[in-house]
Every structure is written in C-alpha cells, then in structure tokens.
Design a protein with these regions (language model features):
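N-terminal Rossmann NAD(P)H-binding glycine-rich loop of SDR-like oxidoreductase domains
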Residues: 2-27
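Conserved glycine-rich Rossmann-like NAD(P)H-binding loop of the short-chain dehydrogenase/reductase
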Residues: 27-34
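NAD(P)H-binding glycine-rich loop region in Rossmannoid oxidoreductase-like domains
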Residues: 38-98, 102-105, 117-122
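Short alpha-helix in the Rossmann-fold core of NAD(P)-dependent oxidoreductases
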Residues: 89-93, 112, 130
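Conserved beta-loop-beta element that borders a ligand/cofactor-binding pocket
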Residues: 115, 134-158, 165
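Substrate-positioning beta->alpha
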Residues: 158-159, 177-199, 206-209
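Mid/C-terminal beta-alpha module of Rossmann-like enzyme folds, strongest
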Residues: 196-259, 272-313
Length: 313
C-alpha cells in the first residue's frame, strides 16, 4: 500500500538511494532539507518532494509531519566541531527528541531510525550519542524500528572511495588502528532493509544489526582498495600512541579526514552478532561483487577531470 513518508537526511549517501527506491515503490516521499536550492525538484524522481525546513525547530517539524504515515530519520554525523560531544548530541540525541515530539504532536505513529552498530557500547562521543538517541526512540511510545549498520559502502561512499583518493596522494599510508575490524554492509542492502521494515508490521519494536558477510581489518580494506586500483602502496600500521597523535593533528585539519573521536570509535570492532539482514530475508552482498564498480566509478571521474584539465588548463 502506498504510504506518505517524510525523510530526514534524505539527501545524504543512504538517503538519496532510499528516497529513490521508496518513490519507485509508489510511496509519496517528502524530503526535508535546509536548502531547497541545492536539491531542485526537477532532478528528483517522480513522487519525491523537497521542503525547506529547520529540522531543529520542533514546531516546523510538526507542520511537516502532519498527514504523514511514517517518518524516517537518517540524520547522522561522523565528526563535530571541537571534541566535547556537543555536536554529536545535537545531531543525534536532541534532533531525535524533536522528531519524537513532532511525531506525537502530528499524530504520526511509525518511526524508522538510523543508528549504528555498537550504539551505546563504545568510548567515542559518536557511539555514546547513538546509544542515547536509541533510548529516546525506545521510550517514545511510537511504533519504532531501529537500524544499526556497520560501515556502509557503495558508489560514492566514505570508505573505499575515500581511501582510493588518499592512496593517490602518497606511496605510504600511516594507518591508526590498522587491526580494527569491520563487516561492511552494501548501501543497497541497507535500503532494502528500510524498505522491507516499512512494509512489515513485525519489524515494530525491533533493532536490526546490518552487516556484511565478510569481516576485514582496516588495513585489509586499504590493501583491497590499492589492489583494485592497480597501485602498490606501503601501509604503515601505527601503534596507538602515534595513532592518537595522528588523530589529534587531524582534529585541526579542515574537513577532519580523521579525528580523535574516530580513533575512539575504532577501539570497538564494527562487527555484529545477530544478522538483521537475514532476519528481514535479505542475502547480504559481498564486497568483491561491488568493489570494481565503486573504484571504477571513481577512476572514471578522475579520468574525466584529467581530460578536462588537459583541454582547459
């Protein structure tokens, strides 16, 4: 049955793919954005509307939620300004409180919440705030479902694509927490999990750990990226003392490619215990199947840029 769905974070990596899929399923999708000019509706799939909204204004949220059948909150950040946890609390905890309150006031009963594997079980502000946000959702009285993914990969991701960019810069990569473990999950599988849970009443009150079938160390992920790109690179694992110093230095680099809070997150392996994908009837996608597309896409963009520079510079 077609639903009216409001999505927060619908313009991000996961959100873009999810919104497209929900629209293809026939749902009426409203995406809340701080700046509509960045997302002209002519570029959106049929059935998707963007509304300019201050998501930190509970009254504005209530207005936008009116008449919706479900709300999906995908908002999340990996870094904050400074290192005191305030940015994470605002993006994860306070916003979730506003969303829950607005759902109640608008009469929306269904809430799907993005979280993270190890939410509430780690030393980082990121993981702590994710756990606090989950507690807000669980106490909301709404018909909620929570998703806890490991690191998410796909075309344009912040994992293989980002490491591909970094590997091009130097023959040596000093790597903090090189032995940290991940079970990367494909963005398409995450989207399918949200899609199925939205249509499945038995998903109400459930927490789904979303992770892939393969477990890799951080060093193995970097090596896979280099091999796929045909590069020979030396990975230099850093002891934790040097890794902390590296993170501290990057705290002051614009864009924070790595941070002290990222380092603390890496102290907890991002691997699951209860397979949420199989619980939803989804066969997890293996990295080897998608990696050529991810890095091939990145190579195509690099080649197009090189051709542009050759013509115009």
């Amino acid at each position: 049955m077609p639903l009216r769905v409001c999505v927060l974070g619908g313009t991000g990596f996961v959100g873009h793919a999810l919104v497209k899929r929900l629209a293809a399923d026939g749902h009426s999708v409203t995406v809340l954005s701080r700046n509509m000019a960045l997302h002209p509706e002519r570029l959106l799939p049929p059935g998707v509307m963007v509304r300019e909204t201050n998501v930190y204004d509970p009254d504005d949220l209530q207005i936008q939620f009116a008449g919706m059948d479900a709300v999906i909150n995908l908002v999340g950040i990996l870094n904050e300004r400074g290192d005191n946890g305030r940015g994470f609390r605002r993006a994860h905890v306070e916003l979730t409180q506003f969303v829950v309150s607005a759902c109640r006031q608008a009469g929306v009963r269904r809430l799907l919440q993005m979280s993270s594997l190890n939410a509430g079980r780690g030393r980082s502000h990121y993981l702590k705030s994710r756990g606090e946000a989950e507690a807000v959702v669980k106490a909301s009285g709404l018909r909620w479902t929570i998703f806890e993914p490991s690191v998410i990969y796909g075309i344009g991701d912040g994992l293989f694509t980002r490491f591909g960019q970094l590997l091009r810069l130097a023959p040596v990569m000093p790597l903090a927490r090189a032995d940290a473990k991940f079970a990367p999950v494909f963005v398409g599988d995450v989207v399918e999990a949200f899609r199925r849970a939205l249509a499945e009443p038995r998903s109400v009150g459930e927490v789904y750990e979303l992770y892939g079938p393969d477990v890799f160390s951080l060093a193995e992920i970097v090596r896979m990226t280099a091999r796929q790109l045909g590069m020979r690179r030396w990975i230099l694992p850093l002891p934790d003392a040097l890794g902390r110093l590296q993170a501290l230095a990057f705290d002051h680099v614009p864009g924070k490619p790595f941070s002290s809070d990222n380092f603390r997150s890496l102290l907890t392996d991002s691997v699951g215990g209860i397979d949420g994908l199989h619980r939803l009837g989804i066969e997890p996608t293996r990295v080897a199947k998608i990696l050529p597309d991810i890095l091939g896409h990145a190579n195509d963009k690099q080649a197009r840029y090189a051709r542009f520079r050759a013509r115009h510079v």
